Amino acid sequence: MFPNNKMLLIAGPCVIEDNSVFETARRLKEIVAPYSSSVHWIFKSSYDKANRSSLQNYRGPGLKLGLQTLAKIKETFDVEILTDVHSPDEAREAAKVCDIIQVPAFLCRQTDLLVTAGETQAIVNIKKGQFLSPWEMQGPIDKVLSTGNNKIILTERGCSFGYNNLVSDMRSIEVLRRFGFPVIFDGTHSIQLPGALQSQSGGQTEFIPVLTRSAIAAGVHGLFIETHPNPASALSDAASMLSLKDLERLLPSWVQLFTYIQEMDTVSI
């Protein structure tokens, strides 16, 4: 599906807010350009955040306008596109535009959604639910494989640890790798504090550098990073997104570590 020697970087804003998404895509392409031989960039953004903490929170432009926007970004910047879907009907529509359709963590056991996603023959990124052990991902994988589609990505995004907290168990990455599909670490959702701000989730972005480096050292094939020009003003996940400026600062260390790990001799016990 992807070059074996390149780090996957799935990056973009949490949700399409307005036409500023085009400037974000332009900046991302500019940031990644110096590392084109080492990084395979995929643009991500959502047309609808269906699981916002509060009914009053911004959800996005909706399916029709959102997919039109993603199609324009794909054409303008010559980049592959990922977006998340929430129903079988959405999966069918999104697959007409997007290269990768994502099954959200909260929906990762929904049989109809997984089967329909597989039937589109698009690449399917299954995010591991915060409530699942890594070995339980066999079930969601089998549902997609039942359609004859083996183009699967698995994403680790932390697991629930008491109320309003997530932890990242790096053993999970090794377990997921053994399924034989590319494994991605979500460096921004993994530092969320779900519901900690009551009407929205909090976040501890100061832990993004150490967790992303740890995940790369553990053997992930790439990173999932939600990024924004000014996270404080973002309409969704303001507390957990990484600024474009900080992404640009962190990218060299990610690439350097990924290259080093790729060149190491792996020792199994």
Swiss-Prot record:
Keyword check for Cytoplasm:
yes
EC nos: 2.5.1.55
Gene3D superfamilies the UniProt entry points to: Aldolase class I
A GO MF label:
3-deoxy-8-phosphooctulonate synthase activity
Q: Where is the protein situated, by its record's location annotation? A: Cytoplasm
Pathway-wise, it operates in: Carbohydrate biosynthesis; 3-deoxy-D-manno-octulosonate biosynthesis; 3-deoxy-D-manno-octulosonate from D-ribulose 5-phosphate: step 2/3; Bacterial outer membrane biogenesis; lipopolysaccharide biosynthesis
Question: What broad class of enzyme is this?
Answer: transferase
Question: Which biological processes are named by the entry's GO terms?
Answer: keto-3-deoxy-D-manno-octulosonic acid biosynthetic process
**What Pfam families does this protein's entry cite?**
DAHP_synth_1 (PF00793)
Q: Which GO terms describe its cellular component?
A: cytoplasm
| Catalysed transformations (reactions) | D-arabinose 5-phosphate + phosphoenolpyruvate + H2O = 3-deoxy-alpha-D-manno-2-octulosonate-8-phosphate + phosphate
Q: What is its main location?
A: cytoplasm
UniProt KW keywords:
Cytoplasm, Lipopolysaccharide biosynthesis, Transferase
- SUPFAM superfamilies associated with the record: Aldolase
List the HAMAP family: KDO8P_synth
**Which PANTHER family did the record assign?**
PHOSPHO-2-DEHYDRO-3-DEOXYHEPTONATE ALDOLASE
NCBIfam families xrefs: KDO8P_synth, PRK05198.1
Q: What family does the Swiss-Prot or TrEMBL record give for this protein?
A: Belongs to the KdsA family.
Name of the featured protein? 2-dehydro-3-deoxyphosphooctonate aldolase
| Species whose genome carries this gene | Chlamydia muridarum (strain MoPn / Nigg)
The UniProt gene name for this protein comes to kdsA
